[in-house]
Structures are given as C-alpha cells and as structure tokens.
Amino acid sequence: MQTEIEIKFFVSQDIQQSLSNLLNSIGIISNAQVELGNVYFDTPTLDLRRLEMGLRIRRSDDFAEQTIKCRGQVVGGLHARPEYNAPVHGDVPMLSAFPDDIFPSLAVRDEIQGKLVAQFRTDFLRRHWLIAFEGAEIELAWDQGEIVGSLGKTAINELELELKSGDASALFALAERLAGLGGVRLGAQSKAQRGYRLAGLGKPLALQSLPVVNGVDAAMRITSGLQHWQHHEQYWLEQADPEQRRLALQEIRQGIALVIEAAGMLVAPTWLDALITQSAHLALLAQDVVEPEWQMALSALFHRAEYVRLQLAIAAWLHATA
C-alpha cells in the first residue's frame, strides 16, 4: 500500500512552450511518455462507490496493472488517497489480489467480485518527468486524452504532481512554479469522478449550501470553506446560464468569507491579506451587471497565477497544520 500525495491542475490553454521552459530550468532525473488505456469497474448498484473506492485496470503496450484507491481527502487540489496495485490477468480485476482488510468483510468482497462490470474508460497520452526539486523527488505527469462514458465523452488535459520522496513542502513549491505557467487551475475532481458522471452514475454538480461548522476548530472551518469555494468554482465553469453563474459566485464568496472568518481566529496566516483583497475584488465583480464582461473577467481570474497560488498557499497551510 502507498498513500498517493498529488496536486492536480486542469489546463485550459497551450502550455507546451512555457512548460518546456520551466522544465529546462530544474533538475530532470528521467522522462518518458506512454499511451495509457484505463477501464473503471463497479457493480451495477455502485457498491464500490458507496465504499468510496475506485477500481481500474490500466494497460499500455507492455504493461497491465489493477489498482484500487480507497477513501482519501482532497483539499485545495491536494489529493491524498491510499492505493493498492497488483498484476492483472484477464479483463476483469480480481479483488482477492488486494489486502482483505480494506473490505468490510470477505463475503462483501466476494459478492462485489461477482457483479463487477466495466463502467467507463479513460484513454490518454501521459508524458512524465521525474524531477529533483528542493531535496524531494516529484513526478510531473501531463495527461491529454479523453474520458468516455455512456453519456458521451470529455477531454482530459491535466497536470499532476506526485510526491515520490521528500517533504510535501517541495511539492507545493513546485506547484507554485506550475501556477506561473498561466492557463492552469487547481483541480479537485479526479478522472474517476468525472467518469462516473459521464456514465450517468454520479450526481451532476449542483449548488450547495455552506456547511454548518459550529463546534469545529479553525482548520476544519478553513477546509470546509476552501472546499465550498472550489466546488462552486468548478460549477461556475460548467454552467452556461448567467443566473446560475451568479448564484455560484455568491457561494464562492461565502466559502471565501468562511475561510477569512476562521483565519481571523488564529495568528494571521501569511495568505490572509491576499485573500481579503481577493474577496473585495470578487465583491466588485458580483455588482457588475454588464454581460458578458463580468463572466469573461471571472473565467480569466480562475486561471490567473496569483489566484491559483493563493489557493495553493491555503492548501499548503492546511497540510502543514494537519
């Protein structure tokens, strides 16, 4: 078992040259590229999803592996999930290849095994680099391809930083450099989450009420606020209706307000002043009734380096205080 610690970015513009320039300025240990095909499995009644597990078979020309990912945490684009890998023979994963204790019982495991079916797939080109950075080894992967489900397909264009060894502070420091590429933003949704939705098996993104945080400490309040903020950022980007976008912006501002309120209970974090400034800027955008200028401005903001770095700073603070 390993706990995968990674930071994911969604890419919205051509970063080929700027990424190449960045890579030329840091220490590359090795690099390669590979075409990957992934098929995700669950039962027709989504028993694995209810257990907060994701199961796939990944193949390339000379490689096949089954992976199960268990319940983890996503905060500010930082994904931390236990995962287990095993060789695979055939077209259906064998759950007995994984540790018994990750399942509620062997009877449950065997029942799920008998009902496994393919639900969706992802196919992409992965270019990856192993990087020596600030005393750590970090893998940078650039995935470009598509997710295919029964309801259609959607593009994959993602950067992922995975900590292989060393301290997570180096991971965040390199993520800050990537934010400077422009046209990238932190991604809280995994390929599997997006795939379930494309297969008609996951709930569509929707507006959510701010969570009740009475009786929890400041760090948990900040976590809740950041998650609320990022959820509605993604919702905003997926909507075309201006009214839905205005409602999403209201929720983004509420999430940020919760983070600011909770941070005020502490010795002021270094990112607090920048967040207050950002909150004021969003308040001005919320008052703008001119279409489509305010929407264009907000879309650009979501991909701006200083905006992404602010979210990264909050996520890094949360990781350091956990």
Where are these regions (language model features)?
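Function-determining surface determinants
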Residues: 1-322
